[in-house]
Amino acid sequence: MNTDRHSFKSDQTDALSLSVYNVGYEKCQGLHSWGSGVRDHYLIHHIISGKGVYKTPQGEYHLSAGDTFLIYPYTVITYTADKNDPWEYYWAGFNGSDAEFILDRAGFTRECPVISADFGSELKDSLERIYRLSGNRSSDLVKMTGQLYITLGILMERSGSQSRSGSTAKGYVTKAKNYIAHNYTLGIGVENATDFVGVSRATLYRAFMEY
């Protein structure tokens, strides 16, 4: 992919428990913006270069290469590329009964809809593969959905947030760091971080000491 934008939009989005709605890639121009507005599906963006700002009702997130952000359905949002170093990203939009459960296990929340983790090229390559599999035949839809599950599995594995009930100490630390990094301008404290992670202050302290 070597031009500024490639995308595909499916005309069948309700056939499976998880269905790809759209997928693509874009190298944005400076200050290119979407919103304010709402989407009617979940939408993940994975930034591979540059930076920009993502605004939701819960906060404002200054993001850069390596960050992955989630747009929730029917939530008023805006996202804007940086003027001097505009972002370049891959995206995948999807719906289905499995979506909320999987995204929750990957560590996304409305309060912190961003994951910062070292994916190398794995996540980018997986999103690009969804695009390369795109088509409106039933077989295409199944292949795209299969690759979407793989993509979300990568997010779950690398984010360190397998589940709220069974997170490891490393998962606690990763989740707390993500929350702090993207909400520090709101004047948050330790209690906000522990409430978000879902553990006691002592448990989070021990996790940070371990990692």
Describe each PLM feature range.
Residues 36, 55-56, 80, 115, ...:
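Short, hydrophobic secondary-structure boundary micro-motifs
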Residues 110-116:
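Short, charged recognition helix plus adjacent turn
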Residues 95-101, 117-182, 203-205:
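An amphipathic alpha-helical interaction segment
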Residues 2, 6-8, 15-110:
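N-terminal regulatory/effector-sensing and dimerization cores
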Residues 27-28, 75, 155, 180, ...:
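Generic helix-packing signal
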Residues 186-211:
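Basic/polar phosphate-binding segments, predominantly the helix-turn-helix DNA-binding elements
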